[in-house]
Amino acid sequence: MRNLIISAALVAASLFGMSAQAAEPIESGKQYVELTSAVPVAVPGKIEVIELFWYGCPHCYAFEPTINPWVEKLPSDVNFVRIPAMFGGPWDAHGQLFITLDTMGVEHKVHAAVFEAIQKGGKRLTDKNDMADFVATQGVNKDDFLKTFDSFAVKGKIAQYKELAKKYEVTGVPTMIVNGKYRFDLGSAGGPEKTLQVADQLIDKERAAAKAAK
C-alpha cells in the first residue's frame, strides 16, 4: 500500500511538474520578439495567428502533425491563417501554387498531398503545368487551376503576402505571428510543442488586453 501511495505521489508530482513547465512564463526577446510596428489583422475583433511556411521546407513539413490538431481546437475568437513565404525561385512557385489552391477553395483538400509530394515523393512542382498535372490527380480541375494560377486575384495575393512578410520581418520558416504584434519560431520557442505553448500564451495575453480595453 505504501508503495502505491508513493507511486501515486510521484505521478502527481510529475504531472504538476509538466503543468508548471507548460505554464512557464514567456518573455519578449527570448521566446518571441515584438514587431517594430504592429500590422493590422485581417478580421477585426478576432485574435489572428499566422503561420508562414514553404512547401520545400522540411521543418514546416515536420511541424504539420503538431500544428494541425492544435488549429482544429482553436476557439472561435481566434482566426488562423496560413501564408506562404516567398523569397524568390521555388519559394515563389510554391507560394503561387498554395495561393491558387486557396483561391479555388480547395487548399484544405490538397495541402497535405502537395507537402507529401514535395517532401517525400521527389516532386519539385515549380512548373505550373507540372502543378496542374499533380493537382488533377487530387481531384482538382486542371483547366480551372491554370486559369486561376495566372489570375489577377492570385497575383494580388502574391504581392500582399510578400509585403506582409516584410512587415513581419520574416527571414525563415516556419514562423508564427500573433495578432500582428509578436513573431516567433521553432528555434526561439524551443521546439514544435513549445512553439504552440508560446502561441497559446500570446493569444491569452491579447484576449486579456482586449477585455481590459472594453
Swiss-Prot record:
UniProt keyword Cell membrane, yes or no: no
Residues in the signal sequence: 1-22
CDD domains: DsbA_DsbA
SUPFAM superfamilies on file: Thioredoxin-like (SSF52833)
Keyword annotations of the record: Disulfide bond, Periplasm, Redox-active center, Signal
Domain Thioredoxin: 23-154
Molecular function terms, GO-annotated: disulfide oxidoreductase activity
Domain of life: Bacteria
This protein's record includes keyword Kinase: no
Cellular component, GO, one term: periplasmic space
Compartments (UniProt record): Periplasm
Disulfide bridge map: 57-60
InterPro entries: DSBA-like_thioredoxin_dom (IPR001853), DsbA/DsbL (IPR023205), Thiol_disulfide_DsbA (IPR050824), Thioredoxin-like_sf (IPR036249), Thioredoxin_CS (IPR017937), Thioredoxin_domain (IPR013766)
Listed Gene3D superfamilies: Glutaredoxin (3.40.30.10)
Family: Belongs to the thioredoxin family. DsbA subfamily.
Its job: Involved in disulfide-bond formation. Acts by transferring its disulfide bond to other proteins.
Protein name: Thiol:disulfide interchange protein DsbA
